[in-house]
């Protein structure tokens, strides 16, 4: 992994139902490689879960969704958690943030159910994506071209 010193990452979640490893592991990885990481949420504290149903720790976010956008950040990370994403994908602030990142052609990384936000924000059409197999139909119905890969980068315009 390249040195990320001087780079800034924004991680956004709704609050309840965020998968703890999908939030904390990317944050730790980015920090270990030099990135500044901001965690923003719609609610405070963030009530994490594991396995979508087992309560885990609470995390205090750095900012609210209303306080952040694409400006000042190099990458957006969207962790999963079924309940987290079911709420985040209908959140107008999350839509605004996603559209800002896409319009600025900045990197976006979605984990597990994270691509639901791309669909609901209206930025999926014609892009390629991978996801958990159980999300495939949602991704295709949302306008994505789904590919069966462990990780995938869509280099299309915008």
Question: Which residue stretches match the model-derived regions?
Answer:
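Charged, often glycine-rich, active-site loop that binds/positions anionic groups
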Residues: 51-59
